[in-house]
A protein has these predicted regions:
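Short, solvent-exposed loop/turn elements at domain surfaces
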Residues: 57-61, 190, 240
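N-terminal low-complexity, intrinsically disordered segments
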Residues: 44-78
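Short, well-ordered loop/turn elements at secondary-structure boundaries
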Residues: 44, 175-177, 226
Length: 318
């Protein structure tokens, strides 16, 4: 007489087994805020004004000549709190009763919503640098070009582009310490496969204090070339097609080169009108618990002289 077998007792066998652990998404690091001069001295209003004073002039003096008194040039830098964003989710009472994973889902709401807002912040900061320059223009400052297309084959990056970025920052009187390059993964691929660059790569960050102090902690550091600590970001703005000084790029991305010297030298300025704030409440009419994270912020390119944008094609890694 046959005993119990799997074939004859399928109704007693669990065909599908469910893991207690929920598969998490792989998340990259968000650190653009490290390069922002954050301000907080605003009790009310939507627009921040920051006055500036120009340089004094020097003139030749001759005897019996009246001195000419000049006024210093002045300016006013403005930026607005232009982003008011939220992330919201809800979970029904029935789902709480029915789902084995209900507690895990509820616990994930605040951190996932906060993460979503910070991705929006990261994207906004990086986009503001590109928006702060004039497209299809060299954006020349003191004779140095602050926006140009990569000089390599197919608008890829080359060692010459690093030298040009350093030259432009020097002409703009930017401190050449704490130099940082934030590049697209396609640029990292190009750099890692160019024989003439591999020998110039330093495997450790040159600006050790930046890593120690947290200025660039979290970015995926690659190597150092010509004084630039190179980091990779997936959130750099795409520029599509653009022609600068008769050189064109298609499927372009904006890569940034600048000095991360702390204080007033930082290339970006910005602040939060409302820090990410979490709200939760039960909606008795819909029989669901609602979770909301909301924030208001504004960012802008603060020092155009401390920003060199090199446009490269993402096709370089294809």
């Amino acid at each position: 007489m046959a005993g119990m077998t799997s074939a004859g007792n399928q109704h007693l066998i669990r065909t599908d087994l469910w893991s207690r652990q929920i598969k998490e998404l792989l998340l990259d690091d968000l650190n653009a805020m490290k390069f922002v001069r954050m301000i907080s001295d605003f009790p009310d209003g939507q627009r921040i004004n920051s006055p500036s004073i120009g340089e004094a002039e020097v003139a030749d003096f001759n005897e019996n000549m009246a001195i000419k008194y000049n006024a210093l040039d002045t300016g006013n830098f403005q930026f607005n709190f232009d982003a008011y964003k939220y992330s919201a989710n809800a979970i029904s009472e029935k789902f709480k009763r029915d789902s084995y994973y209900a507690s895990d889902v509820i616990a994930a709401f605040p951190q996932r919503e906060h993460r979503a807002l910070m991705v929006a912040v990261e994207t906004d900061i990086l986009a503001k640098a590109n928006a702060g320059q004039t497209a299809s223009n060299l954006n020349t400052i003191n004779g140095g070009n602050h926006r140009f297309v990569g000089s390599g084959t197919g608008a890829s990056i080359t060692l010459n582009d690093f030298a040009r970025a350093r030259y432009s920052l020097t002409k703009a009187q930017v401190p050449l310490n704490n130099l940082v390059a934030i590049v697209d993964p396609s640029v990292a691929f190009t750099l890692g496969t160019q024989a003439n660059l591999v020998n110039l790569m330093t495997p450790n960050p040159q600006w050790q204090s930046m890593v120690r102090d947290g200025n660039t902690t979290g970015f995926k550091f690659m190597f150092n070339i010509m004084g630039f600590d190179i980091y990779i970001s997936n959130y750099l703005p795409l520029v599509g097609s653009e022609t600068i000084n008769s050189v064109s790029v298609t499927n372009g991305v904006a890569n940034y080169f600048f000095s991360a010297s702390p204080g007033d030298t930082m290339p970006w300025i910005g602040g939060f009108r409302q820090m990410p704030t979490v709200y939760s409440e039960f909606n008795k009419d819909l029989q669901q618990t609602e979770h909301l994270t909301i924030a208001e912020w504004g960012f802008k390119l603060y020092r155009p002289e401390n920003m060199v944008t090199i446009l490269t094609s993402t096709n370089a890694a294809a």
